Amino acid sequence: MAQNGQGIEPAVLDDIINRLLEFRNARTVRQVQLSEAEIRSLCTASKEIFLHQPNLLELEAPIKICGDIHGQYGDLLRLFEYGGFPPEANYLFLGDYVDRGKQSLETICLLLAYKIKYPENFFLLRGNHECASINRIYGFYDECKRRFNVRLWKTNTDCFNCLPVAALIDDKILCMHGGLSPDLTDLDEIRNLPRPTDIPDSGLLCDLLWSDPSREVKGWGMNDRGVSYTFGSDKVAEFLMQHDMDLVCRAHQVVEDGYEFFAERQLVTIFSAPNYCGEFDNAGAMMSVDENLMCSFQILKPTDRKPRFL
């Protein structure tokens, strides 16, 4: 592909990936010190690819789908150990790469590097934390400032503003970070969302990244997050029927087993950060979709061993 590695020499890109993977079998999760120029070049090259590809990605199975990572870099490496390091498998990540965990920079750098190296096999969606007003507060800004400078945080923000927001797998599985929206009646509405863009406080883009399913509501309800809506199983069934789809696949909420079904298996939540924040005893999961659109789950068990950061 012409856009493959645009702006980064393939040998330089491979060197960055090799350094990021250097500690993949170590018992301790170490910091990987890339230069500011290297991180900047990852942001610039990947941004070009994101804008070259549609806002609603149209993908084919087989593919592995991962939920929130939140800077838990050691767990991201464990996911790849389980699922196969790219290009062994195709991947779709559902957003929330940064904040809360200690290694947001390593996490986003490896994901962007794989996006540049394998643009047609490796896909990243935007989560609600890929937004300046959120990651300014929950850790990513502080990590950028501590390890580099505020300018690098702004470079990442420019990149995040170009991420696609949804993916459709074989016309049957719709994937996004948050959930459905009362403003979503036609998939062209997703395709036509402008980029680059910040995330607004309401409307379709906001809902795709912020809404949550709820067993307590029918239709649309208030969301405790103070942003967007909750939606009942009736809205999931209605949406799938109208669009001749089988499944909504989303992330955005910690679930004990790493995955959780809703609405008679018409929606699944995937969360891929085990022992989230060191405060939860949740597992992490990755969903494998095979050629026949059969879904199975690979589980990262919560580990008793707290990683030591060097």
Swiss-Prot record:
The protein, known as: Serine/threonine-protein phosphatase PP1 isozyme 2
Q: Which organism is it from?
A: Nicotiana tabacum (Common tobacco)
Its EC number is: 3.1.3.16
- Organismal lineage: Eukaryota, Viridiplantae, Streptophyta, Embryophyta, Tracheophyta
Q: Where does Mn(2+) 1 bind?
A: D68, H70, D96
Q: Does the keyword Disulfide bond apply?
A: no
Q: How is the cofactor bound?
A: Binds 2 manganese ions per subunit.
| UniProt GO cellular component terms | cytoplasm; nucleus
Q: Which UniProt keywords apply?
A: Hydrolase, Manganese, Metal-binding, Protein phosphatase
Catalysed reactions listed for this entry: O-phospho-L-seryl-[protein] + H2O = L-seryl-[protein] + phosphate; O-phospho-L-threonyl-[protein] + H2O = L-threonyl-[protein] + phosphate
Question: Which cofactor is essential here?
Answer: Mn(2+)
Superkingdom in the source lineage: Eukaryota
In which family does this protein belong, per the annotation? Answer: Belongs to the PPP phosphatase family. PP-1 subfamily.
Q: Which residues bind Mn(2+) 2?
A: D96, N128, H177, H252
Q: Name one GO molecular function term.
A: metal ion binding
The annotated active site, in chain numbering, is: H129 (proton donor)
Is rRNA-binding set as a keyword in this record? no
